């Protein structure tokens, strides 16, 4: 689901013409059976709370879940779940999947779709506002929102457990650059880019190590800083966070490890020598 409701009428009209031509195959017109049963059938461009609805092509749904490496061990939340296809696809992969959707008709449609696909036991849909919902137990978040809404969600996402995967259709997170990007073709004609972010651990600050004081600066998943040993201060390079995993270099030594709250444990490699290292966050 994309597009804020305040976009000008002419811009919306032009956009809908384009979308109707390119995604009509993904959004069939009301058929006789639906009309006869009075079941709700969504239409491309229908108004929503913050956005209008445009379906995500199934090939892109598959790519989003592939990038996020969704397994039966995951808990997935789709923020603005529309007709439920992302949630249903995740449930088919064995994940516990939840859709948060403001439109009650779309929620009921999603529940019917889940029942038809035989995954009602794993796919749950709730009528709610994504900005007022608690999805803190998620291991995977998926979304299809404008950048302004993504950025509004960004602080909440960054406060989630390190290693949580965030997969988005076509729109980015501003200064928080994606860890992976992929494009799909096939049945996808518009909005065909998949982005993946991995929520990084919070490491900015001073850490005590056996080799001296490690001072880290953090900008999302990128880290910089210095290691001070005695009267020497050495800059770190190639600093990166991948969820709880941290890596950087100091001179010829390459450090890797896992962040666990206020401690880090790992291995440093210099030439052929491998040495365990650990750090404690300064108080």
List each model region and its residues.
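Conserved SAM-binding loop of SAM-dependent methyltransferases across substrates and taxa
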Residues: 83-95
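Bacterial N-terminal signal peptides that target proteins for export
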Residues: 2-12
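Conserved class I S-adenosyl-L-methionine
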Residues: 72-82
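Central antiparallel beta-sheet cores of small beta-barrel/beta-sandwich binding domains
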Residues: 201-283
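Conserved SAM-binding motif I beta-strand of class I
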Residues: 96-101
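S-adenosyl-L-methionine
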Residues: 25-74, 104-137
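C-terminal substrate-binding/active-site "lid" region of AdoMet-derived donor-dependent transferases
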Residues: 150-202
């Amino acid at each position: 689901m994309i597009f804020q409701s305040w976009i000008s009428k002419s811009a919306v009209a032009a956009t809908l013409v384009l979308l109707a031509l390119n995604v009509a195959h993904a959004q069939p017109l009301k058929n006789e059976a639906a009309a006869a049963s009075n079941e709700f059938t969504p239409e491309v461009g229908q108004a929503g709370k913050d956005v209008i609805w445009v379906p995500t092509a199934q090939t892109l749904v598959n790519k989003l879940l592939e990038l996020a490496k969704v397994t039966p061990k995951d808990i997935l939340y789709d923020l603005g779940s529309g007709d439920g296809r992302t949630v249903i696809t995740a449930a088919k992969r064995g994940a516990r999947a939840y859709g948060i959707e403001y439109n009650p008709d779309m929620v009921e449609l999603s529940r019917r779709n889940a029942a038809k696909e035989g995954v009602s036991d794993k796919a749950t849909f709730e009528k709610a506002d994504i900005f007022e919902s608690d999805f803190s137990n998620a291991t995977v978040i998926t979304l299809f929102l404008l950048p302004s809404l993504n950025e509004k969600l960004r602080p909440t996402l960054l406060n989630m457990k390190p290693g949580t995967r965030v997969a988005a259709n076509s729109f980015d997170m501003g200064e928080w650059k994606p860890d992976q990007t992929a494009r799909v073709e096939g049945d996808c004609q518009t909005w065909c880019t998949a982005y993946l972010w991995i929520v990084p651990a919070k490491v900015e600050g001073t850490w005590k190590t056996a080799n001296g004081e490690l001072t880290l600066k953090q900008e999302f998943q990128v880290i910089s800083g210095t290691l001070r040993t005695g009267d020497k201060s050495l800059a770190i390079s190639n600093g990166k966070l991948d969820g709880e995993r941290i890596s950087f270099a100091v001179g010829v030594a390459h450090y890797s490890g896992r962040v666990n709250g206020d401690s880090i444990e790992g291995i440093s490699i210099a030439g052929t020598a491998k040495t365990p290292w650990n750090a404690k966050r300064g108080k």
